[in-house]
Amino acid sequence: MKATGPLLVAVLLTCCSSSRIENGIFYSPKGYQLRLPGDGWAVLPGGAAELELQRKNPDGGMLADATCDGKTTSRPLAVLTRHLTFGLGHRETVETVQNEAGGRQAERTLLRGTVDGREVAVEAVVLKDKRCVYDFVYVAPVDAFEAGRGDFQTFVESFAGATR
């Protein structure tokens, strides 16, 4: 996953070493949990995000991270989403949807662009409450994007956070 790896690194905000995975559930010390996607996805240890996943066939990567400080939570969703995708060149926003999910503000953005000269598609989801900003990113080559998009949507929908 040479081409999508740099984007994952470029979009990360924090690292936390005390997270754990039990019975297919990722538990963050920041108070949220996620169900890991199914077949073919592997956890990449030692990344800058709390959770990074990679799939080799078809190629793709996803991550989850949270930032829990007053400064970040005060920023608009659009700004937070742009920060997630700084490493994307020749960016084109395909779609942006803002709504509320589970008492949290949410923005989902679908983009296309390039990483290391390779065309990729990116889906970025930002959830925000009074305590934290939760970031989710899926990136894959354009021709492999749809193959993993359902896994990403299920991954994001499995989010369970701490009481707001």
PLM regions and their residue ranges:
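Post-signal peptide N-terminal segment of mature Sec-exported envelope proteins
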Residues: 24-48, 52, 56
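Surface-exposed amphipathic alpha-helical segments
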Residues: 38-41, 88-90, 134-164
